[in-house]
């Protein structure tokens, strides 16, 4: 016997794709031998239903009439006959497996012994090597009989009742063929001689399916029970989480404070319809939100709530901006202003001028009555100090955020200063100078030597008696400003 013939005799045809496969490519855990490709394509949880559908289609399209089998072809499943003695009895199209005592079904310990052939394990439950080659190609699996799991019985019965309407003979064949492998031959004869009425056969199919479901492999039972459990309880869990978040508010509270419903686990829009549907009006299987298990304490209105602890980055201090933000929130303003103020309080790393500029703008927008001078007075009187307002050199903070009633003026010429465009003495906060006066002072003192405060005094640095002086880069910037202005005015 050539190697090609040996390989062909070892191949097994898949029940779904009818292609010859090697034993390692076959899976025997379902009611029919199927290849791994079909199982991966259909999914292990749906393969039983696909096998049952293919079985009904083969039966409906007349695969039971006798046809000769080619050397490499699989015979249809309904043409497999008894292998005991071919001439002892006529071939019966629907008698799929031999039920004589010569070949008992391989279940339990016998199935384990069937996988050992001369001490060599045969992979994945493949039939014994002493079986005839034609049986190896015809998928004779006596321990697998057709049966539908209980959760698929109504669907299969309903569809077959319509598909087989007007074919009572074929329906009786269907009912008789649903017997498990352990049914005796006498019971099989009784099934054959039953009247061809539709209802008794379907009820008999119900019983045999239930029995066969108990005899089914544990893997198949677990796989078939996964899908309904997964679909139902995942949805219920999501809906319960929505009820926890939106259930406590009554209808009046919902109208007043819609921000309680801002964060949801459900993509449905806000509104009364959503809450009514969640509370059990639309779905009967969900527990209602009025049950004791899902009751939550009512949320107090925002006017009684203190500002959240996360508004200020410093937990032991109460900056004036945080109090102003709380007052603005209680007065009905948007909470965005409170968040902006909190971000400003935390932003002490920026330059002093920019920080004060941001604070003054935000304070005017949020209607806060505090000015930097009042803040300094409050700090001197014992109000907790705001760490976010500290700078590297406190004296270099320009008092740029004084309200418009007290304009910024130059110390020398008393001209009004712009908010950010002037020279500030780092030692004396009241020393503010415009750029023209600063230029004149630098020119008078001589730009090459030490240039001190434009006021004419030698203001000392903080904590020392050494007077401060302009750096060369600052002098160049102040002197270059005059040139830039002239260039801008040129046509």
Curated annotation (Swiss-Prot):
InterPro entries: I2BP1/2_C3HC4-RING_sf, Interferon_reg_fac2-bd1_2_Znf. One of its GO terms (biological process) is liver development. Residues 254-264 have a biased composition (Basic residues). One of its GO terms (cellular component) is nucleus. Residues 347-376 have a biased composition (Polar residues). The keyword Secreted does not apply. It holds the Pfam family IRF-2BP1_2. One of its GO terms (molecular function) is transcription corepressor activity. Keywords: Metal-binding, Nucleus, Repressor, Transcription, Transcription regulation, Zinc, Zinc-finger. Residues 60-213, 245-330, 345-399 are annotated as: Disordered. It comes from the Eukaryota. A zinc finger (RING-type) spans 410-457. Gene3D superfamilies: Interferon regulatory factor 2-binding protein. It is found in: Nucleus. Acts as a transcriptional repressor. This is Interferon regulatory factor 2-binding protein 2-A. It comes from Danio rerio (Zebrafish).
């Amino acid at each position: 016997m050539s190697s090609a013939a040996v390989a062909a005799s070892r191949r097994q045809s898949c029940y779904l794709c009818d292609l010859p496969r090697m034993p390692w490519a076959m899976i025997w855990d379902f009611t029919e031998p199927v290849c791994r490709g079909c199982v991966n394509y259909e999914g292990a949880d749906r393969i039983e239903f696909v096998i049952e559908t293919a079985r009904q289609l083969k039966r409906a399209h007349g695969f039971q009439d006798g046809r000769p089998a080619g050397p490499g072809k699989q015979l249809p499943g309904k043409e497999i006959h008894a292998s005991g003695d071919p001439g002892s009895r006529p071939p019966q199209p629907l008698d799929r497996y031999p039920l004589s005592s010569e070949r008992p079904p391989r279940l339990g310990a016998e199935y384990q012994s069937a996988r050992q052939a001369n001490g060599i394990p045969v992979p994945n439950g493949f039939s014994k090597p002493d079986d005839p080659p034609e049986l190896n190609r015809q998928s004779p699996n006596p321990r697998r009989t057709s049966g539908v799991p209980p959760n698929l019985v109504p669907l299969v019965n309903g569809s077959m009742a319509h598909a087989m309407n007007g074919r009572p003979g074929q329906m009786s064949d269907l009912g008789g063929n649903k017997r498990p492998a352990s049914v005796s031959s006498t019971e099989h004869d009784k099934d054959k001689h039953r009247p061809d009425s539709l209802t008794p056969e379907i009820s008999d199919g119900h019983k045999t399916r239930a029995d066969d479901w108990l005899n089914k492999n544990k893997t198949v039972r677990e796989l078939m029970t996964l899908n309904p459990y997964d679909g139902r309880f995942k949805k219920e869990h999501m809906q319960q989480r929505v009820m926890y978040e939106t259930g406590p508010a009554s209808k009046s509270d919902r109208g007043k404070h819609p921000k309680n419903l801002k964060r949801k686990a459900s993509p449905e829009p806000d509104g009364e319809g959503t809450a009514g549907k969640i509370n059990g009006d639309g779905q009967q299987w969900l527990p209602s939100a009025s049950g004791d298990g899902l009751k939550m304490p009512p949320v107090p209105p925002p006017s009684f709530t203190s500002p959240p602890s996360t508004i200020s980055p410093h937990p032991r201090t109460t900056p004036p901006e945080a109090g102003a933000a709380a007052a603005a929130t209680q007065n009905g303003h948007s909470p965005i202003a409170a968040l902006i103020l909190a971000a400003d309080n935390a932003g002490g790393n920026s330059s002093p001028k920019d920080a004060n500029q941001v604070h003054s703008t935000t304070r005017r927008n949020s209607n806060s009555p505090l000015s930097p001078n009042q803040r300094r007075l409050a700090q001197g009187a014992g109000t907790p100090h705001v760490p976010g307002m500290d700078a590297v050199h406190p004296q270099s903070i320009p008092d740029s955020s004084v309200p418009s009633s007290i304009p910024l003026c130059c110390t020398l010429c008393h001209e009004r200063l712009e908010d950010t465009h002037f020279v500030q003495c780092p030692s004396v906060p009241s020393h503010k100078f415009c750029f023209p006066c600063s230029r004149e002072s630098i020119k008078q003192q001589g730009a090459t030597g030490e240039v001190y405060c434009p006021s004419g005094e030698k203001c000392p640095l903080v904590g020392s008696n050494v007077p401060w002086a302009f750096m060369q880069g600052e002098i160049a910037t102040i002197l270059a400003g005059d040139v830039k202005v002239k260039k801008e005015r040129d046509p």
